[in-house]
């Protein structure tokens, strides 16, 4: 979603700085910020930035994510998103790609703890550029981050495992309640 919850200016500013490199950026989606992003692309003549607002199926989304070298999560100042875990991060991990997460909250901490990518300070374009260049020059690190993310999903976040944990939690509360009364 191209909404204020995400800092797309961070990506635009990185694309401006890296426009003479072979690094390409893709922003895919729809939302309130689509026109702003398109205007910035035109204003700065960003040939290295593709904006695609066409609808795609879930299968196509998976393919697009798998074809990407690195996946970005530029969190904005939304407390709700910064202190929750957007499913987008789990999708990124599921396809086994490294993540660069601009977050001062739980999202960045999660990426760091699962060793599935790099956490940078929110809004810090220089850290984003440095992280992009670091991953570009280190395919082995990209693979390690991607593998770690995928393993995290397989070990902890399948429907089966979540269902079992939820069942145990429900049993715990049922027993707790029966002991109270």
Please place each PLM-identified region on the residue numbering.
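A conserved mid-protein helix/loop that constitutes part of the nucleotide-sugar donor-binding site
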Residues: 3-17, 35, 126
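Short acidic/histidine- and often glycine-rich active-site loop of Leloir-type glycosyltransferases
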Residues: 83, 104-114, 118-119
């Amino acid at each position: 979603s191209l909404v204020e919850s995400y800092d797309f200016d961070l990506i635009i500013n990185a694309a401006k700085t890296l426009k003479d490199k072979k690094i390409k950026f893709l922003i895919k989606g729809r939302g309130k910020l689509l026109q702003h992003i398109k205007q910035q692309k035109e204003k700065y003549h960003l040939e290295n930035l593709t904006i695609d607002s066409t609808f795609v199926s879930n299968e196509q989304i998976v393919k697009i994510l798998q074809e990407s070298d690195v996946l970005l999560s530029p969190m904005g100042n939304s407390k709700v998103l910064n202190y929750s875990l957007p499913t987008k991060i789990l999708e990124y991990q599921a396809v086994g790609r490294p993540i660069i997460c601009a977050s001062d909250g739980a999202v960045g901490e999660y990426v760091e703890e699962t060793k599935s990518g790099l956490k940078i300070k929110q809004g810090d374009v220089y850290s984003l550029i440095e992280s992009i260049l670091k991953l570009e020059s280190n395919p082995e690190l990209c693979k390690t981050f991607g593998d770690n993310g995928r393993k995290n999903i397989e070990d902890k976040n399948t429907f089966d495992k979540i269902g079992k944990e939820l069942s145990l939690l429900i049993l715990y509360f049922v027993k707790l309640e029966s002991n109270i009364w």
